[in-house]
Amino acid sequence: MDGVKANQRQQLQLLLVAARHQLSRSDLRSMIQFLENEDCGFNVTLQMADPSEQPELLELHRLVATPALIKLSPTPKQVFAGSSIFQQLQNWITRWQQDIVVTGLGLSLRPTELDGSRTQRELQLEDQLLVLRQENETLIDRLNAQERTLRMVAHELRTPLTAAVLALQSQQLGQINIEHFQDVVKRRLDEIELLSKDLLEVKSTKWEDLFNPQNLDLGNIAAEAILELEKLWLDRNIEIRTDIPSDLPKVFADQRRMRQVLLNLLENALKFTEDGGEVSLTMLHRTSHWVQVSICDNGPGIPEDEQERIFLDRVRLPQTSVSTSGFGVGLSVCRRIVEVHGGKIWVVSEPDKGACFYLTVPVWQRNGQE
């Protein structure tokens, strides 16, 4: 039997509540493609809403976190959340299809008639258990998000403090005047104040909501980062080579976070480069949608079996020499920042031939991001 004909299909109305950056998740993209292209036995209507634009949806549907998929029709309403939304939907579609077949045959929809070996009470308990699992996944996701936010902000605090210390050392050596020193310290204190506000918002704000993407000149951000670390490379006679095209398009990114990524990668490159060595920073407009950044050094390199691990949380590689302390948690923060922007970050390295870190940043699109 072919089941219910297309013109007799029941409407399946779904609402996906997700922020723009969350829609770049591979599982959500796969789910949307599945609902648009696959024959799942329903006439599917999928609506999408951004919680930042429609915050009332969170209260209306009692959503603890996003992304969340809500089945509005047919009733009863169901909410899918956590890291396995697509898998949950696929599992439930099978049960909904069974309901359609039974209805088409004019039979009762009592669960006991779908599966004689299981009582209606057992199925109700199974549904309740599924809801509890979903809520547990959502709470775990929220706790993990808060932990990531704390780690990111704590790591970011190092940047203005380091810059202030370097400015103090330069002023004491007579390399900058008192006015320049005061200007640097004031700007760094302003940064620390902003970071302290982020810390206060951790409990009420998702990590991703601390990002404020805008039309940004990434070349200028890189130049500022190089200048900020000037003392680190000048004192060690390290040459920094840059290749940034004059026609490089603007990117759509958060200024503070992109600056943090470039500072961290440059600082690592300088740390692993011997005195008199070379560090390069290159930007390329590879496609109409992405700018690719590469930061390379001629240090000791990174073992192949460690090249994935260095981007994981809480991973710190052993020191490679007496003068270096190894890669710290900064790279995991960099990875999360880049991924929130929809980009990717990776490393290419061989022992004793240095390392090149690559990342992609989305190009600012005039029509879609104004």
Curated annotation (Swiss-Prot):
Q: Which GO terms describe its molecular function?
A: ATP binding; phosphorelay sensor kinase activity
Q: SMART domains in the record, alphabetically?
A: HATPase_c, KaiB
Q: Which reaction does it catalyse?
A: ATP + protein L-histidine = ADP + protein N-phospho-L-histidine
Question: What's the Enzyme Commission number for this chain?
Answer: 2.7.13.3
Domain Histidine kinase: from-to ranges: 152-365
InterPro entries referenced in this protein's UniProt entry, alphabetically: HATPase_C_sf, His_kinase_dom, HisK_dim/P_dom, HisK_dim/P_sf, KaiB_domain, Kinase_SasA, Sensor_HK_Regulatory, Sig_transdc_His_kin-like_C
Query: What is the annotated signal peptide range for this record?
Result: none
Its domain of life reads Bacteria
Swiss-Prot/TrEMBL GO biological process terms: circadian rhythm
Which UniProt keywords are given for this protein, alphabetically ordered?
Answer: ATP-binding, Biological rhythms, Kinase, Nucleotide-binding, Phosphoprotein, Transferase, Two-component regulatory system
Know anything about its domains from the record? The N-terminus interacts with KaiC, while the C-terminal histidine kinase domain autophosphorylates and is probably responsible for self-oligomerization. The N-terminal domain stimulates the C-terminus to autophosphorylate.
Q: How does it assemble?
A: Homooligomerizes. Interacts with KaiC. Participates in the KaiBC complex, whose core is composed of a KaiC homohexamer and 6 KaiB.
What HAMAP family does the record tag this protein with? Kinase_SasA
Name of the protein this chain belongs to: Adaptive-response sensory kinase SasA
